[in-house]
Amino acid sequence: MSTNNSDIRVVVGMSGGVDSSVTAHILKEQGYDVIGIFMKNWDDTDEFGVCTATEDYDDVIRVANQIGIPYYAVNFEKEYWDKVFTYFLDEYKLGRTPNPDVMCNKEIKFKAFLEHAESLGADYVATGHYAQVKKVGDEIELLRGVDNNKDQTYFLNQLSQDQLKKVMFPLGAMEKTEVREIAKKAGLATADKKDSTGICFIGERNFKQFLSEYLPAQPGEMRTLDGEVLGKHDGLMYYTIGQRHGLGIGGDGEPWFVVGKDLKENVLFVEQGFHHETLYSDSLIATDISFTTNAEKPKTIECTAKFRYRQTDTKVTVHLREDGTAEVVFADPVRAITPGQAVVFYDGDVCLGGGTIDTVWKNGQKLDYVG
């Protein structure tokens, strides 16, 4: 990298939150030629006619003016609808539980946004993600963020070398508390703004209500695996494997959990007990396998994996198959593996890549969690 940072243009994806605000502030302090871009991915006027994106953009403007950088808003609603939201709905129609954040990073934040940034002469793009990139030989490795509780490599597992070579993650080596501290010291307008939660395009809204606006709900029976009818479900798309809340089953004994779905019969299967044997599996088949480096991969990889965000790593053996899928075998049984979610591979702190959980297996038999 050039010793004179002012020759290096970095376009920062600014959301109006504290993380991206501090990202822009740090890069500006380091002397880079910084431009702030606000991505409008969703038309999110709420029931009171207030567009939360407008409020967020107002915060971007305040922060950009405070740190002295130019800023723009760019509309990616069409790309988002085509690449992320359509996928999200299609997965729910199949009875699965998708992870739109993974797709959003792959298709929008590090593709559509990256391409737009390059049209502005960007050498790099930067975001407020808690992750790190490190040059090793000719390749860039993706590493976990230092703050274990905030590490976001799980959502970045589909990024390619071409994308990783163009990104900067200034917050990757920091704890969240440090980031807030920097924002306060710099007097940034977003220093005390609370972190956003939930899926980007739903925001704080009720998930069930939101989904019902796009997919017709079909209520049906809630049964045990032995066929006992325990009640009605509101629509299979509202439930995920291992879910406890919202089932409405009373009575004594241990709580009830979702253990499977029958799409043809429109039946939700439930069983009692957090550790019910049906919730455990020993392997999975994953599709959409992608690796963060271009180096030749052995057919069998010993590593660790995460099957959901903020989960402890599990030791696994990954068998890459001729058809581009992978069989992932767990060292110990894992609870509530959910089709549609990401499986992400790690070698220590290095994120190797990942895929989408397609089918779940136990003792050589496919489990009909979704079928």
From Swiss-Prot:
Q: Spell out the residue ranges making up region: Interaction with target base in tRNA.
A: 99-101
GO annotation, biological process: tRNA wobble position uridine thiolation
Q: Which GO terms describe its cellular component?
A: cytoplasm
Region: Interaction with tRNA; residue ranges are: 150-152, 308-309
Query: Which key words are in the record?
Result: ATP-binding, Cytoplasm, Disulfide bond, Nucleotide-binding, RNA-binding, Transferase, tRNA processing, tRNA-binding
Annotated GO molecular function terms are: ATP binding; tRNA binding; tRNA-uridine 2-sulfurtransferase activity
Q: List the Pfam families.
A: tRNA_Me_trans, tRNA_Me_trans_C, tRNA_Me_trans_M
Q: Where would you find this protein in the cell?
A: Cytoplasm
Stored InterPro entries: MnmA-like (IPR004506), MnmA-like_C (IPR046885), MnmA-like_central (IPR046884), MnmA-like_central_sf (IPR023382), Rossmann-like_a/b/a_fold (IPR014729)
Where is this protein primarily located? cytoplasm
Q: Which domain of life is it from?
A: Bacteria
Site positions (Interaction with tRNA): 129, 341
> Which residues catalyse the reaction?
104 (nucleophile), 200 (cysteine persulfide intermediate)
The record lists its disulfide bonds as 104-200
Q: Does ATP-binding show up as a keyword for this record?
A: yes
Locate the residues binding ATP.
13-20, 39, 128
Q: Which HAMAP family match?
A: tRNA_thiouridyl_MnmA
The UniProt entry's sequence similarity note says:
Belongs to the MnmA/TRMU family.
Described by its record, this protein's role is as follows: Catalyzes the 2-thiolation of uridine at the wobble position (U34) of tRNA, leading to the formation of s(2)U34.
State what protein this is by name.
tRNA-specific 2-thiouridylase MnmA
GN (gene name): mnmA
